[in-house]
């Protein structure tokens, strides 16, 4: 994977939803940091009801994605925000084109659908990291931006440890060390893609999941759905990310998130694998970047990840 260089062109895409005016603000944000921003048309668009949750029609969003990858002058493809609709274009993506022009692709939440599809059919590492409108324009904590730059710029190589900031309240639900390919993303999207050719396969991998605005019974149901579909068969370790604004649980933050942990234990304890929870990646603040598709080691007792391969060079 080519690393993102200083002053590189970064293309802003909106494969799902968009917010009016956010694309131009994001371009200014990139410009202030010395990059050359390029805004694709759908990132400035929004369909009329009932499809007003989409940033442009499927053909336009797909064309933006293809053009961003095909352009050799583009150093990274960065999603403006999540929302809804990334899954609508999965069948039409030219995965061969993406494979031939692999470059850092950054996003999370609804973009999980693209992460899974790209890893399965294009075969390169993608970055579960902050989005421009959803995170960086919203003023996330400093580790959010720095962790992304460290990951995509090639500063981290094989053997580098990825640690959560000191204020993170990690919880070792099951101790141990495991090595495998990091795979996962937003839990609702992982469950929604069950039974399709884009479904997650965590065999011999380290499973990561996170979510926002979910109730514990729904989290329980989604985990049960994935487990019964065989998605967890052969998984070597589990990394539980941010679960922000758990519905029906008083408060927010790490203390509220701990209400989730007995449920997670129930779903994975029989497997005898390491489980680390409270990792600050996803819809929380900070939102640390993870290299999906990369080989990593999870040390649940130490509360850290180690890269077993370079992810950007």
Spell out what each predicted region is:
Residues 1-73:
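ATP/NTP phosphate-donor binding region
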Residues 8, 73, 99-104, 122-124, ...:
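A short helix->loop->beta-strand "cap" motif at the edges of active sites that frequently abuts
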Residues 76-87, 92, 108:
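N-terminal glycine-rich "phosphate-gripper" loop used for MgATP/nucleotide binding
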Residues 18-29, 177, 181-212:
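Conserved beta-alpha junction segments in alpha/beta enzyme cores
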Residues 93-117, 125-132:
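Short, acidic/small-residue loops that bind anionic groups at enzyme active sites
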Residues 123-189:
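Conserved anion/nucleotide-ligand pocket segment
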Residues 240-313:
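ATP/nucleoside-binding phosphotransfer catalytic cores, i.e., glycine-rich phosphate-binding loops
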Residues 198-260:
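Internal helical hairpin/lid segments
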């Amino acid at each position: 994977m080519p690393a993102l260089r200083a002053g590189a062109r970064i293309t802003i895409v909106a494969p799902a939803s968009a917010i009016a005016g956010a694309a131009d603000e994001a371009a200014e944000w990139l410009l202030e940091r010395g990059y050359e921003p390029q805004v694709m048309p759908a990132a400035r668009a929004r369909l009329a009801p009932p499809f007003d949750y989409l940033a442009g029609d499927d053909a336009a969003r797909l064309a933006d994605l293809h053009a961003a990858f095909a352009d050799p002058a583009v150093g990274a493809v960065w999603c403006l925000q999540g929302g809804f609709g990334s899954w609508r274009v999965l069948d039409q993506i030219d995965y061969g084109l993406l494979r031939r022009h692999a470059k850092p692709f950054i996003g999370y939440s609804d973009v999980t659908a693209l992460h899974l599809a790209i890893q399965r059919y294009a075969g390169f590492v993608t970055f579960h990291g902050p989005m421009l409108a959803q995170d960086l324009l919203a003023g996330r904590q400093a580790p959010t931006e720095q962790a992304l730059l460290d990951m995509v710029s090639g500063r981290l190589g094989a053997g580098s440890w990825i640690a959560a900031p000191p204020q993170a309240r990690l919880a070792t639900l099951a101790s141990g060390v495991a090595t495998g390919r990091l795979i996962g993303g937003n839990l609702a999207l992982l469950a929604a893609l069950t039974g399709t050719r884009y479904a997650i396969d965590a065999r011999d991998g380290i499973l990561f999941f996170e979510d926002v605005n979910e109730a514990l019974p729904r989290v329980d149901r989604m985990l049960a759905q994935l487990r019964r579909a065989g998605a967890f068969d052969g998984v070597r370790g589990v990394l539980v990310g941010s679960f922000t604004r758990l519905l029906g649980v008083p408060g927010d933050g790490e203390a509220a998130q701990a209400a989730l942990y007995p449920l997670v234990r129930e779903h994975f304890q029989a497997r005898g694998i390491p489980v680390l929870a409270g990792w600050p990646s996803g819809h929380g603040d900070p939102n640390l970047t993870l290299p999906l598709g990369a080989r990593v080691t999870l040390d649940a007792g130490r509360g850290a990840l180690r890269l077993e391969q370079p992810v950007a060079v």
